[in-house]
Structures are given as C-alpha cells and as structure tokens.
C-alpha cells in the first residue's frame, strides 16, 4: 500500500470567450491534482499532468453557414465612430467589469465558507443566524445577496479569523502525521509477542478522527451559478448538528471579594469554572455570595468623614456653608476668587492682622460664601510712571508726523522753539507775551506747511505713506 503525495497545482487553461463561465455540469473546478481521492477520474489526472495550449474561441460563422470561423478582422479606428457608439461601448465595458468583479467576490466567499466548514474550530463556532450562503443564481439575475456574508465576515466570523484558523489547523495536521509516522516506524517484529504493540495499537484506536470525516466536493460549491448551502452538509454529518458546542469552554474567574475568606474564593472559582450550569443556578449562587458580603450602608467608615475636622466650630460652619450634605468634607481652597465663591480663603489670619500688611489691606472687601465672610485684598493699579498733574513743557516743538516736510523748515521750527524756551527762562512779563505770539505764528506756519506739502505729493507717494 502506497500513500499518495500531496496534490500540486494544475496547468491553467485560459479561455477567451464572451461568456464568463460555460454552463456545463461536467466542468472540473479543481485546481490541484486529486489522485488521492476516490472520485478523481483518470481523465482529470491526465489533464493535470499534460499541459495543454490555451484555447481561443472565436464567435461567428461564415456567410455560407459553415462552422468555420471568420478571419480575424482588422481593428477599426475610433475616428469614424459616433459619440453615441463610444458611450454605448463604455457602458457595456463598465457593466461587464462590474459583473466580473461581483462573480469574483462570490467565488472568494465560497472558498471562505468551505474553509469554515472544513476546520473543526470554525465549524463548531457557528454564529450565523439563518439561511446559509444563498448566493445569487442566474435565474434571479444575481440580484439577491445574503446579509450573513458581508465584506469582512462569513456567516458571523471574520475572514482573517478563518485564515488564521486554517493555517493553525494545517500545522496541527502536519504534527499528527509526524506523530503517527513515528509510532508506525517504532513498531518492529520484536513487539509482536509483547505488550508494547498492544499499547501502540490502542493509542491509534483511541485517537478520534471524526473531525476528518467531513465529505466535500469542490465541484459542487465552486459552481456559483447554482445555489449551495454549507449548513446542509453540516446537518448531514453523523452525530453532529448545527449548534454543536465547542469542546473547550471558556473559563471566567471572578475576582475574590475578600482576601481572608478562603471559602468564598473556592466557591467562586468552582461555580465560574462550570459554565455549563443553568442561568438559574448561577443567579442563586450570586445572590448567596452577595448576601454574605457586608453592605456599605450598614457599616460606613466614619473615621474618613472626620479626617479634616479640627473643632466643632469648623464642622458647624462647613455644614451651614455646604447645603449638599452635612458630612461633606471641605478642603481649603488654593485659588480663592470672588467669581468661584470659595468656601475658605488661603490667606491666614496672621497675615491679615499683621501691622506691616495693614496698609496694603486697607481697601479689602468681604465676599460671602454661604454664611461665611471671606476677606480678600482689593485690586489696585500700580503707581503711574508719569504724574498726570504735572504740566508738560509745550514750548519744545514735537517732531512732525509727516515725513514730507523739508529739513530746513524743521530746523527753523526747532530754532524758534529754543528761542521761546530762553525767553521763558528769563522770567520777564514782556518776554512771555512775545512768546505767546510767536507760538501762535508757529502753529499757523506749521499748518500751512503741512497742507502745502500734502498737495505737492503725488498719489503714489501718499499710497506708500499710508501703507
């Protein structure tokens, strides 16, 4: 007895025709050699071993009606084609591409469904609600789709999960093959009369291979023009059903409530490990556990409530200032503000009552926070650098804002201003009167010079000044 080698890829045959897939029931959709299978015919193996040349199908016949194809026509240029014909061809091409893409997605989903059916871990975790994979058929023009198979999930399971499970399952099969090969090779003629052979044969008999007894014909589900439901195959399995539970149950351990009570911990772990119990039993257990625990309403921790209390007066003030609860702890405010209404100011009484700070706290104002008065410092502006009551010396001429005034006129103004300052310093009454007259003349001349200068400037110069 010889074991077959692993299957290999067949030679791909490209068929160029207008039909997407020929409607033939005898088509072989397998891409690997199936010499190991019983239903594989000799024709299939021959076709897989001998590569064939691509077949090109050309539609159309001759004018005489014979089956011989016409000669290949030359490609016509699109210059003589109307715009309507071009739009029609583009629309047909777009529809053809959409149909091809849709059929490709259906084929991919079928393969994922086959993987989910073959892998025991995915087959047992059947989370789908109903229906199976009712893929669209040609009779309904492929208009109906199944809600269970969306872009990322196949019957409630993610495609990535199915791929990961398939890889791990293949690794498991490789491991089983290696172990069986080691057991078979270790059996020798010396063990025929002893008990070692019986133990090894018993190990083979005890190994359950029901997970591998899953019949599947790829030619059935890969024909997307026909409906195929993998749940029907699952129901046909002997001793299995659609809602088969997983052999490995998930163990959920609750955190122990009390470290000292070891009995409660053991009961909690015992009931959490047995996930097969009914929900009523689990509810009874949870009610018993909750009744044995102390409730915070009956045993409050009173020491925490009086942690920040120093005297009875402070407790009474806190109760009056905070109407939420008489047991509310009021922490000293670090950032007092009249807008936030602090409960207690961060300024101590020693600083307020000190004589050094009496001058700075003279303008203090009290703000009420509930029934407590809080003393805060009144905000005041700093002393001005320049005394507004002092008279400025108006005799000194200021620099003109307009840069268009000639420099000679500015020098004359400065000289006149210096002469006026000298007359003021002399202190005579006659010089004061002359100074006032000169000042009026200076203002008039300045206004005239400014107006003349503005009129003399061009528009571009004005724009540059404004900018």
UniProtKB/Swiss-Prot annotation:
Checking SMART domains in the record gives: HLH
InterPro entries registered for this protein in UniProt: bHLH_dom, HLH_DNA-bd_sf, USF
Keywords linked to the UniProt accession: Cell adhesion, Nucleus, Transcription, Transcription regulation
Q: Which GO terms describe its molecular function?
A: protein dimerization activity
Q: Where is the composition biased (Low complexity)?
A: 257-275, 312-322, 345-365
- What highest taxon heads this organism's lineage? Eukaryota
Q: Where is this region: Disordered?
A: 43-83, 128-149, 245-275, 312-365, 390-439
Q: Where's it found, cell-wise?
A: Nucleus
Instruction: List GO BP terms, alphabetically.
Output: cell adhesion; positive regulation of cell adhesion involved in single-species biofilm formation; positive regulation of cell-substrate adhesion; regulation of transcription by RNA polymerase II; single-species biofilm formation on inanimate substrate
A Pfam family annotated for this UniProt entry: HLH
Where does the bHLH domain start and stop, copy by copy?
Answer: 92-173
What protein name applies here? Transcriptional regulator of yeast form adherence 6
- Species of origin reads Candida albicans (strain SC5314 / ATCC MYA-2876) (Yeast)
